[in-house]
Amino acid sequence: MEKQYLTVTALTRYIKTKIEYDPHLQSVWLKGEISNFKNHSRGHMYFTLKDENARIAAVMFAGHNRNIKFRPENGMKVLVKGKISVYEASGSYQIYIQDMQPDGIGNLHLAYEQLKVRLEEEGLFSQVYKKTIPPYAKTIGVITSPTGAAIRDIITTIKRRYPIGNVIVFPVLVQGESAAPSIVQAIRTANEMEEIDVLIVGRGGGSIEELWAFNEEMVARAIFKSEIPIISAVGHETDFTVADFVADLRAPTPTAAAELAAPNIIELQEKVLQRTLRLQRAMRELVHKKEEKLQVLQKSYAFRYPRQVYEQKEEQLDRALEQLVLAKERYIDKKVNQLKQLSFYLEKHHPSQKIMQTKVAVETLQKQLQREMQTLLQTKEFAFVRAAQKLEALSPLKVMMRGYGLVYDEEKQVLKSVKDVSLGDAVSVQLQDGILDCSVSGIEERELNNGK
């Protein structure tokens, strides 16, 4: 019988199918220590889970790890939920994690510190963003469990201190996996209502695990985004949660939160009484001062002799009117003088004057130009006549009229010496009235003797 050989891929896929169809391996709860932790740029987490005797590769994709409450680190002990599968490329089995939590109180404290540091770096704890708690809130919203001692303490304290105030309770879960989303939704609902002036968010005391909902990042960010001022009241005085740092004001207990949110009506009544007395005293003092002033006025000269005062004022009015008339006349005279000066200036600098002056200047220049052109033409004409006379005196035609002629060779070059021709050469002689074509039949040389 021929043996059947499997490929590595086929074997790996077979093993992967076996594992993935095993119901016990599709929902595995596992605890271990993180090592070789790597956070990929795309958001996926890759690490190893180990205990004293074994280890397993672990993967947590970005879609799942964005909801975890802490930042994983090497050496941290965790509780995870996931499924087992095979990574074909390496042939190794690994756990694909869907949920992860710190294992033990120590790791919860680490997760708490990690979130606190990160939110503080983002500025969520800064005093710059803290809203002022209104001193006389008409309506107080309370976000807490409807059945705990905290709600009883808060309502009792508000009704005792400020019975005219309104209280609206937003019942929520304060511990467990659904607590944080429940608190976040209540904060959003309260912000959609216009009548809420201040919010109390909190619960009674408990362990770190029981208070953990108030350490959730989503709760911290919901408190930070709230338009309504929030007083946090979580646990006892020694309990501090992330919500306390983000809230606009932290109360050590729910009862203290109610005291901070609701003014004491007895103290308010006392303040109103004191201010009423102060106002009455101020009014009495004001009336007394006005009465004294009235008495002074009644004793004054104006009240005792009103006619004389009237006559004085009438005389002052007449003088003022006279001064006004004089001032008006001076003002008019001043403006008339200014107008005359401006008219004289405009007349002096009127464009017609400048046009006339320019026209005279142009006519003068034209006459001067004509004279200079006439003189120049006469000078040039005289020079031309003299030059023509000189040219005529030097003209060969004048010489020819006295019986002389010009002799040219066959190339029409003027012959200046008998040495330039030979016997039999054809020459032409230009006379005054024509040209003779000749042939050299004899040559007789003569010595030059002073031109003779």
From Swiss-Prot:
Q: Which UniProt keywords are given for this protein, alphabetically ordered?
A: Cytoplasm, Exonuclease, Hydrolase, Nuclease
- For whether the record's keyword set contains Nuclease, the answer is yes
- The family this protein is said to belong to: Belongs to the XseA family.
Q: What is this protein called?
A: Exodeoxyribonuclease 7 large subunit
The protein's location, in the record's own words, is: Cytoplasm
- A GO BP term, please? DNA catabolic process
InterPro entries the UniProt entry points to: Exonuc_VII_L, Exonuc_VII_lsu_C, OB-fold_nuc-bd_dom
What gene name does this entry carry? xseA
Q: Do you know which PANTHER family this protein is assigned to?
A: EXODEOXYRIBONUCLEASE 7 LARGE SUBUNIT (PTHR30008:SF0)
